């Protein structure tokens, strides 16, 4: 059995940043103690959306369909899109060069939108009006986040398996909500089930709260503050998945430039890589803290392989930075561009030390 454990990055990057003052000093309408202040700081620092002025965030203002589409597109890393609105979507009310143009193409191509946004009648007739400035109901954003989680993970979120305490998300209530919000759309049981699955997932995952003990207000326009809070909570559940996908995309981009086949992200490899990442703050080495080889983590995760490699790094704050660091190190680059490797796992942890971020790539073939 061939096993390789290549050299560490010789220069570790020490990430020391200046803290940006939190919401109170930045936005006068989101003072310290505001229920969404931490979330507002989060979305602004992450670059998902900005204030409505230099000193205001407008937390209670509603979010339009175009705004929310752009926010999710940015969260996904603003991936390159192929085609245009005219060539890839049925929508005819989006001017060329609109700030949300690429976001709409991406969302349409990846099934982020609920059916009632893209279908005229609930059947095969496409809707030609996107209505970018229309306010977005809470149920629509829950549905878009649900679809976004599917986009990130490649699998539908697990069903909640518990009855919600809200009287306004019953089948009868949602039929009425859909009919009032989208009178052109002929909803059926499948549409109602979609909403129920999305809001149930969002509620049980702690992403969305009710507006009272017995109501979720699915038809109420979602506010900027509510979106900020939901995205911060979503990131707590799915943020690592997005980092893993970003590392994979960058690795495959480098492999494509060399004419190599892309790697796939394997769940059991990622499980092993995550274990290894958790060990690096204790011992930054290809040897585990208990003295065993790094590759014993593969066996523990049930990974079968003929050849394997590991890259590790510390101090890089983003997927782009760490992959660039690996690609500029001969041994790590050799792993990334190894034609014998077919699968990869990615691990990442943050530690309260000078390096902050610890990364692991595990490769097998």
Residue ranges and their predicted role:
Residues 40-43, 72, 107, 145, ...:
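A short amphipathic alpha-helical interaction element
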Residues 45-47, 224:
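Tandem repeat domain/solenoid detector
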Residues 47, 111, 206:
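Phosphate/pyrophosphate-binding loop motifs in nucleotide- or prenyl diphosphate-using proteins
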Residues 232-365:
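Functional surface patches built around histidine and acidic residues
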């Amino acid at each position: 059995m061939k096993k390789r454990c290549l050299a560490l990055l010789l220069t570790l990057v020490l990430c020391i940043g200046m803290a940006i003052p939190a919401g109170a000093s930045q936005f006068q309408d989101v003072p310290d103690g505001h229920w969404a202040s931490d979330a507002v700081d989060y979305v602004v620092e992450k670059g998902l959306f900005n204030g409505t002025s230099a000193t205001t965030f407008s937390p209670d203002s509603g979010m339009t369909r175009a705004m929310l589409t752009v926010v999710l597109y940015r969260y996904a890393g603003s991936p390159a899109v192929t085609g245009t609105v005219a060539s890839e979507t049925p929508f005819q009310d989006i001017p060329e060069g609109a700030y949300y143009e690429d976001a709409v193409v991406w969302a349409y191509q990846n099934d982020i939108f609920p059916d009632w946004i893209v279908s005229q009648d609930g059947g095969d007739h496409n809707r030609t009006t996107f209505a970018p400035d229309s306010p977005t109901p809470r149920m629509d954003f829950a549905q878009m986040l649900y679809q976004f989680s599917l986009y990130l993970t490649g699998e539908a979120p697990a069903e909640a398996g518990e009855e919600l305490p809200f009287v306004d998300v019953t089948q009868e209530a949602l039929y009425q909500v859909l009919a009032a919000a989208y009178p052109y759309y002929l909803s059926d049981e499948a549409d109602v089930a979609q909403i129920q699955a999305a809001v149930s997932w969002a509620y049980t995952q702690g992403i969305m709260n009710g507006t009272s003990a017995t109501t979720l207000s699915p038809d109420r326009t979602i506010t900027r503050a509510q979106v900020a809070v939901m995205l911060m909570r979503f990131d707590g559940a799915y943020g690592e998945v997005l980092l893993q996908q970003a590392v994979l995309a960058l690795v495959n981009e480098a492999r494509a430039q060399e004419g190599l086949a892309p790697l796939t992200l394997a769940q059991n490899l990622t499980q092993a890589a995550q274990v290894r990442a958790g060990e690096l703050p204790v011992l930054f080495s290809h040897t585990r803290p208990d003295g065993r080889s790094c590759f014993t983590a593969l066996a523990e995760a049930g990974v079968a392989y003929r050849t394997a490699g590991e890259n590790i790094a510390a101090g890089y704050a983003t997927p782009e930075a760490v992959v660039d660091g690996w690609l500029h190190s001969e041994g790590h680059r050799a792993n990334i561009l190894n034609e014998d490797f077919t699968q990869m796992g990615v691990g990442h942890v943050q530690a309260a030390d000078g390096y902050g971020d610890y990364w692991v790539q595990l490769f097998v073939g």
